[in-house]
Amino acid sequence: MGILKRHKSYLLTILFAFISFVNSTSLMANDIHQLQNNNIKEMKKAKIVFLITEDPDNYEAHKTVPRFAEILRKEHGYDVTVLLGSGDRGSYSYPNMKAVSKADLLVVFARRIALPHKQMNIIKNYLAKGKPLIGIRTANHAFTARDKIGEGFEDWPEFVADILGCENRGYGPVGPGIDVSVVSENANDPIVSNISPSRWHSEGNIYLVAPLLDKKAKVLLTGKSNDITQPIAWTRRAGKSKVFYTSLGYPADFEMPEFKTLLLNAIKWTLK
C-alpha cells in the first residue's frame, strides 16, 4: 500500500507540473499574440491631413502648421500630410486631395476660400462617413468666400454652423490679447485635463462666437479680452463626426506648450 501511495503521489506531482507548463505556455502565447497585435497597430499609423492656406490674414499657418506636423511625425508617430493650395480665394485648389479621402483625421486652418466642386465634395463625403474634424482659428470662416467665386468653384458657408456649431460674429480688439482659462466644470475632460497651468495668455485677438449655435457643445476653454468673454475651444458632434474647434492659433500660440498639448490631446480624442 505504501508503494502505491507513493506512486500515486508521484503521478499527481507530474500531472500538476504538466498542467502548470501548459498554462504558462498558453499565457506566453497570448502575450506574444498581444505583442503582435500591438505591433500591427503601431504599423498602421493614423493618417492626419491638414488643409492650410498662405494668406496675409491667416496667421502664418503656412509656417506654423508644417513645424507642428513635424512634431506629430517625429515625436508621436503620426502619418501627417500638409496640403497647401494655390490660386485666388475665389478659385482656390489643393494638390493631392485624394489624401483627404484616405485620412483618419482632417484638420482645417484655411480662410475664406472657394474650391472646385470635386474638391469640396471630397470634404463633404469625408464628413458624411462620420470621420472626425479639427478646426483651428480661421476655420470658422474657412469656406465662406467674399471674393468673386470662379466658374466651377463653390464655397460652403454652412460649414461653420453645421460642422463647427457656431457663427463668426466678428473679432475683439488686437492689443490686449486673450486670457485663456480651462472651464472648471470640464477640467477632467481628456483634452484639457493635463494642461498646466490651467490659465495662460495668448497674444491673438478674441473671436466673437457666443452664444454657440450648438447648445450641446462642450466648452473646454474660455477667453477673456478686456471685458469680453467668449468660448474659445469646444467639442461637439456633427452627425457621427467628432469635431473639435479652437479659435486659438495665433503664430505665438504654436510656441506655447499649453496650446501644443491642447492640439495633441484633441487629435487623440478625435481619433479614439
What are these language model-derived features?
Residues 33, 73, 78-79, 101-102, ...:
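Catalytic beta-strand/loop cores that center a nucleophilic Ser/Cys/Thr
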Residues 24-29:
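Boundary at the C-terminal end of the N-terminal hydrophobic targeting segment
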Residues 2-14:
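Bacterial N-terminal signal peptides that target proteins for export
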Residues 47-142:
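Helical hinge/lid and interdomain linker segments adjacent to catalytic or ligand-binding clefts
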Residues 51, 112-193:
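A glycine-rich, often tryptophan-bearing local segment used as a flexible ligand/cofactor-contacting loop or short
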